[in-house]
């Protein structure tokens, strides 16, 4: 802003001062009082038209500065890229609509899958039921035969066991009793025979003796009777006594009769066998007939109707998505273009100030060339041509000690900021910035993709909903058929089982009753009845009760129940795919793609294409930036080698030492005191700005030239150009010390003493101003009291 204000002030002063030409070595330049600046853009009066561009001409071209041009190139690249993106979006829209129609067809086919699958499922279910029923009947037939034989075996085993026990117990007991009775009878008969024989002998003898006695005694004669006495005849009684016999057969007749009447239970077994076999045989006959004739009819299962989905035809979500996507891209394009255009316009403002400042610097350097107060013409031209990088190099070089290191530091900055190097860097940065803008557009595009994915998810939900409805309807009808089949089998097949088990239980009850009846007939009224009934209950009754209990359990559990179909039998996989984390399992996805589905893939391909372009341009731009850093690295290596290497002497082929200032006696006699010296010391030696600042009683702090000091800078006119400003500060009474040539002392500047003559002071002052590009301060004892001249930075 100071430079711009100085330029405006110079325009005003231009009209208040008439131009005057000097015929001296400074011909063509005006002399102005201290502090007055000419219009630095005005050409000399005798050279109004110049072959070079003035400030106004330079300012007229600020709108085509490098940064504005780069931003315009970026705008053009973005316009081309966005035009390509819009074309890709249009193609993606067409592809997405086509894919949506395809997905709609796929969804209709998926929703119609129950129609096609149900026929096969119905046939498979019917075949399964037929095989299951036939297998169950065959198993039932074999089970009936096995149960029949087992029941008969158990009954035979129980009756035979019971028969054997009864025969063993009762027959054995009766035979023992009969044998004992017969033995007792024989013993008694023998004893009676002996007793009766003895008695009959004794009676016979008594009879004979008695009759003899009576015959010898004539009792009638005694009593006057002629009757002979009677005789005693006991033979008949003796015979009767001898005939006494005990018949054992009459004693064990009842036991023999009981022994002969023991039951063999053959009738019971035959009766039971006939009763038990009858239901079994009837059931087996029915099972055989059913096995041959049974076949489940699959036509009783329902068949769902075909479905036709129209979620794309009746829905404008995809159209709305792409319209919104184009609007979003247009909005992003407008925002980016507005920002870039504003940045391109605003870039002209600092470039205008840059031209003003560069023009002033060029005027200063031109003044130095005019006065020939320089030692390095190339350095002066470089500073005039590249004022910014040269000034940056000057500031950087002050951090190094030694004239060679400072020159190498400036050379490194000049090498790194050369026009070709900066051109490569600018291209790389512009490319990266373009990639950034395109990346913003890409993220905007990717941000909209979830909305389309949600719409596609709704499409899938439509398909799954249709599948669920068809599957549930079919499952209800199929389950009704299965339930009817269960009822029919339970009533017709297992009804026979229930009848059979009931008949067997009834038969066992009849068997028990017949056994009890036979035992009552045989042992009723005898002492063996209760033991026999106890044995019967132990051996037969408990086992029959167990068989009846088992048959009752069979009757209670003899039923079949085929599993029913789940309502989501046809939609389970499709519904599960919606919640699956892997995209390849989505039933709407193409197996050859890795995106969620074909519809979103149409938009994703646009993003991938733009991403590939951004990646390619980013690699190219990064390569350009890398090339620039390679250039910088080459310069840095050269500088490091130069700083670390030893300087060659003149005898070794090195360069001659550079003088501190020009030999004015040889090269330019009587020309070492240009206009600037008169401005510095005045025409009489005591009215210049140097004397003004060096007089005692001046300002407590004096501002030194070349800008950047503690306060406002003094102006030093150079043939109409604005003067540089002071940087360091010293008091007017301080004396400057002498600094040996070639020494570097930080960044304060070279200080010289008043041992030199005035002409040497003037020439040295101009020399150091001309060689100010060295950017270092020479000297050791920089400040001392006494009179001195203003310091100069080189």
Curated annotation (Swiss-Prot):
Polar residues: bias regions: 11-27
Species per Swiss-Prot/TrEMBL record: Botryotinia fuckeliana (strain B05.10) (Noble rot fungus)
TM region(s), chain numbering: 67-87, 150-170, 333-353, 422-442, 623-643
A biological-process GO annotation: plasma membrane fusion involved in cytogamy
PANTHER family: PLASMA MEMBRANE FUSION PROTEIN PRM1
Protein name, entry field: Plasma membrane fusion protein prm1
Keyword Ribosomal protein: no
UniProt keyword annotation of Transmembrane helix present: yes
Ranges of the Extracellular topological domain: 1-66, 171-332, 443-622
Gene symbol of the encoding locus: prm1
Role, per record: Involved in cell fusion during mating by stabilizing the plasma membrane fusion event.
